[in-house]
Swiss-Prot record:
Domain notes: The WW domain may play a role as a transcriptional activator directly or via association with the transcription machinery. The WW domain mediates interaction with WBP11, ATN1, SF3B1 and the C-terminal domain of the RNA polymerase II large subunit. Except for the WW domain, the protein is intrinsically disordered.
Coiled coil: none
Protein name per its UniProtKB record: Polyglutamine-binding protein 1
Source taxonomy: Eukaryota, Metazoa, Chordata, Craniata, Vertebrata
Region called 5 X 7 AA approximate tandem repeats of D-R-[SG]-H-D-K-S, residue ranges: 104-138
Function: Intrinsically disordered protein that acts as a scaffold, and which is involved in different processes, such as pre-mRNA splicing, transcription regulation, innate immunity and neuron development. Interacts with splicing-related factors via the intrinsically disordered region and regulates alternative splicing of target pre-mRNA species. May suppress the ability of POU3F2 to transactivate the DRD1 gene in a POU3F2 dependent manner. Can activate transcription directly or via association with the transcription machinery. May be involved in ATXN1 mutant-induced cell death.
A GO term, aspect molecular function: ribonucleoprotein complex binding
GO cellular component terms attached to this protein's record: cytoplasm; nuclear body; nuclear speck
GO process terms (BP): activation of innate immune response; alternative mRNA splicing, via spliceosome; cellular response to exogenous dsRNA; defense response to virus; innate immune response; neuron projection development; positive regulation of defense response to virus by host; positive regulation of type I interferon production
WW domain boundaries: 46-80
Recorded name of the encoding gene: PQBP1
């Protein structure tokens, strides 16, 4: 095990140790535990304002300037008039994400408020519909009551009319019987016989066996089809044709042709 360097030096001064072992060189490995390594030498040489440091961006390998107090950054030196001091992209993304999340929460809250108001409106609409149905039901019940009363009144009036009609018929029959009892002689049927005797000489019933017709006999009926046929040929207004029928003419012609052939 080698002796410490300080002990070797003392022993060498006393002459006890003649050979000094060289101090082993230790390999110094500089480890950077910071994501944004600061270049202190460049910061000192450029004479940056207080709280400003030059830092290398490991993602792109370019330096930028960082204010540790305000947490603002700039690609150019703060002494450069063209420098633009802003927040870092990471900070902007996080702030934008927070703003968007906050906006989404506000939208969700407003949507919930709208849904709540809509539910309130639906509830009020249902209550209005229920009240309207109740009013309609009460109106229908009231109308049924009125209809029932009206029907009873009409029934009573019909009953009264029936009683009045029966009374009138009974009184009419009583007057008729009273007249027959008071008449000294029976009614003559002179008017009826006169009506039967009056007969129009042009009426077919006056000179044929056709039955006597009325004033509407022979007139076209409303529900009778207009076929063009002579409906009076077999009706009550039948008159003898002054000429033979077409069928009789054809039969006579056929008979004449047969007689000629036989001759």
């Amino acid at each position: 095990m080698p002796l410490p360097v300080a002990l070797q030096t003392r022993l060498a001064k006393r002459g006890i140790l003649k050979h000094l072992e060289p101090e082993p060189e230790e390999e110094i490995i500089a480890e950077d535990y910071d994501d944004d390594p600061v270049d202190y030498e460049a910061t000192r040489l450029e004479g940056l304002p207080p709280s400003w440091y030059k830092v290398f961006d490991p993602s792109c390998g370019l330096p930028y300037y960082w204010n540790v107090d305000t947490d603002l950054v700039s690609w150019l030196s703060p002494h450069d008039p063209n420098s633009v001091v802003t927040k870092s992209a990471k900070k902007l993304r996080s702030s934008n994400a927070d703003a968007e999340e906050k906006l989404d929460r506000s939208h969700e809250k407003s949507d919930r408020g709208h849904e709540k108001s809509d539910r309130g409106h639906e509830k009020s609409d249902r209550s209005h519909e229920k009240s309207e149905r109740n009013h309609e039901k009460s109106d229908r019940d009231r109308e049924r009551g009125y209809d029932k009363v009206d029907r009873e009144r009409e029934r009573d009036r019909d009953r009264d009319r029936g009683y009045d009609k029966v009374d009138r018929e009974e009184s009419k029959e009583r007057r008729h019987h009273r007249r027959e009892e008071l008449a000294p002689y029976p009614k003559s049927k002179k008017a009826a016989s006169r009506k039967d005797e009056e007969l129009d000489p042009m009426d077919p019933s006056s000179y044929s066996d056709a039955p006597r017709g009325t004033w509407s006999t022979g007139l076209p009926k409303r529900n009778e089809a207009k076929t063009g046929a002579d409906t009076t040929a077999a009706g009550p207004l039948f008159q003898q044709r002054p000429y033979p029928s077409p069928g009789a003419v054809l039969r006579a012609n056929a008979e004449a042709s047969r007689t000629k052939q036989q001759d």
